[in-house]
Amino acid sequence: MGSIGAASMEFCFDVFKELKVHHANDNMLYSPFAILSTLAMVFLGAKDSTRTQINKVVHFDKLPGFGDSIEAQCGTSANVHSSLRDILNQITKQNDAYSFSLASRLYAQETYTVVPEYLQCVKELYRGGLESVNFQTAADQARGLINAWVESQTNGIIRNILQPSSVDSQTAMVLVNAIAFKGLWEKAFKAEDTQTIPFRVTEQESKPVQMMHQIGSFKVASMASEKMKILELPFASGTMSMLVLLPDDVSGLEQLESTISFEKLTEWTSSSIMEERKVKVYLPRMKMEEKYNLTSLLMAMGITDLFSSSANLSGISSVGSLKIPQAVHAAYAEINEAGRDVVGSAEAGVDATEEFRADHPFLFCVKHIETNAILLFGRCVSP
């Protein structure tokens, strides 16, 4: 499964570079892993250059066994699709330690005949699978149905993923992908230690935020050459943790963003660099929800055929003109004090000399510990 982690990390930073162009000073939140798994679902039925483009952009071409035929991909257990399924099953199963809801599905115009093997395969591997709806004569009802499904899958959190007029009678296919995350820390922050303090959005501007605080032993690294610090906070599940990448300076985010990459993050978070130390941690409460048009994002990254008349999705349906004109990704994350073990009050461990104070813009990610797959990646400019 490790190679999937590498692919998702590489893809994560490719997406980040592209989103940054259009969201220069905004909060950002997306799930590289969820987008990757959705593209894997499409990849199963893509042919020719449509397939080659997905292969390249999502780095599947570097993974063993990914290019096999649909029969081979569904029939074997030791391949990438089943590894993706195993991670998805692990992170989305009912758990007291966190709630991680994923809604990912393809919707096709009901008059198109879908290849039975494809239907069977995506159902088996990707739960959401493919659903037929009537865009042709009831586009708005179809939109309502899709929105209701995403809302129910994310426990009411992500609503109206498809905006009015995003589908019409000409729509052949829509791809929706949404993720909602609420985590429980391994070590809780005590609510009474949370205080309202200024968060410095820029050198000139600040805003009051609810700043959580605790003192504890955490993996941390100070990178003098990169002018930043990294902190790892484990979630109670034991399967995930959150990395916070904090520039030393209020205006240091730009430098961090221009240097960060799959290779760099792997190096920075290696056991030779990060070590467990006693730290005073200050982290703002966060509630973030972002929505992105995947069509324009993926086209800019090199997946162009899928969204145009050049698309070859003959592994999904024999209809010659089938393409995906509309693809949307939504992500939600809530970070607060809640945790499994309540440690003593922050004042009890005043012997910690090191401080990690996230009171200015930073990057963060939620990762799957076993595989290093990046489940969520975010930029917090203004909590």
Curated annotation (Swiss-Prot):
GO terms for cellular component: extracellular space. InterPro entries: Serpin_CS (IPR023795), Serpin_dom (IPR023796), Serpin_fam (IPR000215), Serpin_sf (IPR036186), Serpin_sf_1 (IPR042178), Serpin_sf_2 (IPR042185). It comes from the Eukaryota. GO terms for molecular function: serine-type endopeptidase inhibitor activity. The modification Phosphoserine is found at residues 69, 345. SMART domains: SERPIN. Residues 22-48 form the signal peptide. The keyword RNA-binding does not apply. Disulfide bonds join 74-121. The signal sequence is not cleaved. The functional signal for membrane translocation of ovalbumin becomes accessible when the nascent chain is 50 to 60 residues long. The hydrophobic sequence which lies between residues 27 and 43 folds back on the preceding residues to form an amphipathic hairpin structure which is the signal element recognized by the membrane. Transmembrane segments: none annotated. Glycans are attached at residues 293, 312. The record marks 353-354 as: Reactive bond homolog. The keyword Disulfide bond applies. Major protein of egg white. Belongs to the serpin family. Ov-serpin subfamily. Storage protein of egg white. Lack protease inhibitory activity. This is Ovalbumin. The gene is SERPINB14.
